[in-house]
Amino acid sequence: MTTADGIVRGRRVGDMLAWRGIPFAAPPVGPLRLRAPQPTEPWTGIRDAGDFGAAAPQHPRGVTLRPGKRQPMSEDCLTLNVLTPAAPSAAPRPVMVFVHGGAFVMGTTALGIYHGNRLARRGDVVYVSVNYRLGPLGFLDFTEFSTPERTFDSNLGLRDQVAALRWVQRNIAAFGGDPDNVTLFGESAGATSVTTLMATPAARGLFARAIAESSAPVLVNDGHRARRWAREFMPLLGCDDPAEAARALDAAAPVELGRAGNRLGARVLAETPGLHPFGPVVDGEFLPEDPLTSFRAGRAHPVPMIIGTNAREGTLFPRMLDALPTDAARIDTMFGLTDPEAQARVVGAYAGYPDPAAAIDLGGDITFWKPSVEIAEAHSMHAPTYNYRFDYAPRLMHWAGLGATHAFEMFAVFGYGDSAAGRALTAPGGRRGLRAVTDRVQENWISFARGGVPAPWWPRYDVDHRRTLIFDVPTRVERDPGRDRRIAWTGYAGYRDEGSAAESLP
């Protein structure tokens, strides 16, 4: 296959054609570390594109793909993957570009659930998945440490995603895709990227519609907070002199940056539960304003959007990366500037609070559900918007106290219930239900990607009716699910409000 940068050779995977590890930007190493992505150098000859590219540097133990198999890590990580049905198509295929999650500190497109075969096959679409920089190398803002000799840029991981979308515009037609029919979709940090890119001027025109699965806009940091965290990071790296910061950032090995980042993340979670030092930054340039502000003002890109969350987002986090305020002590700290009466209204909406289950649901709601509803409210006034809640969970997940937890909808989106992991989850019961929900989810995602509207039985969202699709057995439409909680959150003022009451749409 011939791209703008050279010829790539992929491989056949059953009835699909796959090209993996294609560079979409120059390796961000040496003088390009902590700089905006630069164009890749064209190559001569044929470049092998049979294997996934390296994962971005992240946890020192690496990325486990399956028992005994780890994905290599490297700063040279700016690659993407293209998957398309092998059968010829009379017309260009719709394109679905996926941004993986992982709290902006972990993840890789090499994970099996992200391969996309089942989704691309059923939808007859071109599927693209994107690696981007993570952690300190991708989502801390070191710009104030720039010197005349050494410049640092902001929002590096977000800029990587824009560079990948530009690559798609230049090259996807060669793979049979339609550059004018691109759906950008992501989960968790990937969904946060999607909603942030909708407020990013550089991303305008690079995608025609968007799907945000469990977006967490709280991960977007204002410039003041981002600069403070960058300053706190440097002593953790062993550099106490700001004048030496540029040299220290250049000299540090990725593992040293990662360890300092882990320590910073733990400190921030302890001091300000619910916030996270790694994420997009409102820098006034690449990201001019907070995405929620853009949506409320009608300045977000007016593309059709599907947005939603899972019924019990918070239950996963105490068992792994416990980055949410999921216990009463951290929730009290999180409320920060909130009036005590407003706080009482919120906690009163969670039956049993401060019991752990209620606290976990509250933490999940403030991180994912509440801001996603606010985005749906605002965007519905300017563009077609479809809101969902994913409620289905097999028996084993209910037994484990997880329910429809964070990220589980991806088993339906990617048809992963037929994988070994999916079969294990549904062994005690629920395989038929997961297949039914998978059919409904994929039907809607594919219809939306192909023509900009989901299935006809999914009504548009608006603030008058708040009709929301509930993915469950059976799948159904409900009006204003979670109404009592939504109203209770009115008046919440957290850290990012800096002393003013939070805006709330009716």
Protein language model features and the residues they cover:
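Non-catalytic accessory segments of hydrolases
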Residues: 1-155, 274, 422-456, 473-475, ...
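Short, solvent-exposed loop/turn elements at domain surfaces
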Residues: 27-33, 314-317, 396-397, 478-479
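Serine-hydrolase-like catalytic core of hydrolytic proteins
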Residues: 63-246, 263, 285, 293-320
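Non-transmembrane alpha-helical segments in soluble domains
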Residues: 96, 162-165, 169, 195-198, ...
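Sec/Tat-exported extracytoplasmic proteins
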Residues: 169-172, 201, 214, 237, ...
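Surface-exposed patches in mature extracellular/periplasmic domains of secreted proteins
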Residues: 180-182, 240-248, 387-389, 455-460
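Substrate-gating cap/lid region and adjacent catalytic-acid/histidine neighborhood
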Residues: 209, 218, 255-432, 444, ...
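Polar, surface-exposed loop/tail segments
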Residues: 392-393, 451-476
